[in-house]
């Protein structure tokens, strides 16, 4: 819990995805959710509470013990190998929370290409990872975990689902300080460390309009703080101060 956060904290953060997932449950009473690298099962618990048939896979038996204590459906194994064995159009949601930064780019490509194969029309792929737009994350915090491979820019991670044929993609920036969103007076430290420390790519497989329209609001909303937002506001603030000084 020291570095990851308590179970309840993680569950509260994961609720940001519910507006994407809840409509799919209403459209498909037999909706299945697969969580790759499920860890302690916070997302499995949430999707199970929604009424989805949730299943998780992870290599860490210690993590899976927490899932089994909650009677969550899990198994030990390699996530991508498991994904490759699934039938076409058999899943409603495929998720990978803080997985993609641990695998090679070739494995990431395979994950995305297999996800679109196994998802039903209208199904979702969710991939969450540290956000290198946050300079402190990109240059320091990311490397506190020696199993991390390399930071993945949002533009790259969002391109992959587009390349493999997903119909629409949304970047969701996460876990930023809410105080920074409307703060008028930014510091340099705010710029360096204030961009959302995590982000996710949510990608939807194409389907008929009646299905796609159910998620329109979730896909249209804006989420979090980008580095560009903070640098633009900071520059405007500096320019205004220079202008005021020149007028004196």
Question: Each predicted region: which residue ranges?
Answer:
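Conserved S-adenosyl-L-methionine
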Residues: 166-178
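Conserved beta-strand signature within the Rossmann-like core of class I S-adenosyl-L-methionine
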Residues: 122-129
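A short His-aromatic
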Residues: 101-103
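Short, glycine-/aromatic-enriched active-site segment of Class I SAM-dependent methyltransferases
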Residues: 129-148
């Amino acid at each position: 819990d020291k570095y990851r956060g308590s179970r309840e904290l993680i569950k509260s953060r994961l609720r940001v995805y519910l507006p994407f997932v809840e409509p799919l449950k209403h459209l498909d009473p037999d909706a299945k959710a697969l969580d790759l690298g499920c860890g302690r099962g916070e997302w499995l618990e949430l999707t199970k509470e929604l009424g989805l048939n949730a299943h998780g896979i992870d290599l860490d038996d210690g993590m899976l013990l927490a899932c089994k204590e909650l009677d969550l459906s899990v198994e030990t194994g390699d996530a991508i190998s498991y994904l490759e064995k699934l039938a076409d159009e058999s899943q409603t949601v495929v998720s990978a929370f803080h997985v993609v930064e641990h695998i090679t780019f070739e494995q990431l490509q395979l994950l995305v290409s297999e996800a679109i194969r196994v998802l039903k029309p209208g199904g979702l792929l969710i991939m969450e990872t540290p956000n290198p737009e946050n300079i402190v994350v990109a240059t320091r915090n990311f490397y506190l975990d020696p199993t991390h491979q390399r930071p993945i820019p949002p533009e790259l991670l969002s391109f992959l689902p587009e390349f493999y044929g997903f119909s629409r993609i949304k970047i969701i920036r996460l876990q930023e300080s809410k105080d920074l969103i409307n703060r008028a007076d930014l510091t340099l430290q705010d710029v360096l460390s204030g961009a959302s420390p995590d982000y996710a790519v949510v990608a939807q497989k194409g389907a008929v309009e009646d299905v796609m329209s159910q998620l329109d609001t979730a896909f249209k909303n804006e989420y979090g703080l980008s580095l560009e937002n903070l640098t633009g506001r900071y520059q405007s603030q500096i320019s205004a101060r220079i202008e005021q000084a020149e007028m004196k």
